[in-house]
Design a protein with these regions (language model features):
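Short, hydrophobic/glycine-enriched beta-strand segments
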Residues: 19-25
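Short loop/turn segments at strand-loop or loop-helix junctions that form parts
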Residues: 25, 78-80, 140
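Short catalytic/ligand-binding loop motif for oxyanion handling, primarily in non-cytosolic enzymes
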Residues: 29-32, 83-86, 120-123, 143-147
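C-terminal capping/extension of enzyme domains
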Residues: 1-19, 41, 88-101, 124-163
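Internal catalytic-core helix/loop-beta-alpha segment
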Residues: 70-119
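Short, surface-exposed acidic-centric catalytic microdomains
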Residues: 30-91
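Alpha-helix N-cap/helix-start and coil->helix boundary motif
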Residues: 43, 119-120
Length: 163
């Protein structure tokens, strides 16, 4: 598989009541195909979030969208465009960051969390200098982070509830 220049294909998910902003790095191939967040069936994001809010795992895109907004959680990615090979964060180059100022100006975001190291590093390099808002690093829910069990991920992610 060759590296390809990719542009983020879908908008952020948030509304005027969003209090937590979760930033991934860049959508996986599967997410780009579905035009929605965390579309790879082995990504544990939706299982972790459902556990945190003591709810069934949302299945459809509409259920996922409603679930996040109902719980005042916004979703976006740190990267607006990049060169990437498949879904591999380690292959990301030529980064153009997203302007999260759009969300910060429209919603009372209390906490910004990055889902994984690639998102956190991009945030600190490109976005933090613009916003002055610190982000928290959370362990990646990606299947590539297999060392973390679902139980361990849920424990680490509980801090998003301390908004």
């Amino acid at each position: 598989m060759l590296p390809e220049k990719q542009i983020h294909p879908f908008p952020p998910l948030y509304d005027a009541a969003s209090e937590v902003l979760i930033l991934g790095s860049f959508p996986s191939v599967k997410s780009r195909q579905q035009c929605f967040y965390y579309g790879h069936p082995q990504n544990r994001f939706w299982r972790v979030i459902a556990e945190l809010f003591k709810s069934p795992v949302p299945v459809s895109i509409e259920e996922k969208r409603n679930f996040m907004l109902r719980n005042h959680v916004a979703l976006w990615d740190s990267i607006a465009s990049c060169t990437i090979t498949g879904s591999s964060d380690s292959s990301i180059r030529d980064v153009v960051p997203n302007d999260i100022g759009l969300i910060l100006a429209s919603a009372p975001i209390k906490i910004i969390c990055c889902n994984g190291r690639a998102s956190f590093d991009c945030y600190n390099k490109y976005i933090l200098p613009r916003t002055g808002r610190e982000a928290r690093l959370l362990p990646s829910t990606s299947p590539a982070n297999a060392a973390w069990s679902i139980e361990r991920l849920v424990g680490a992610w509980e801090e998003i509830l301390t908004k």
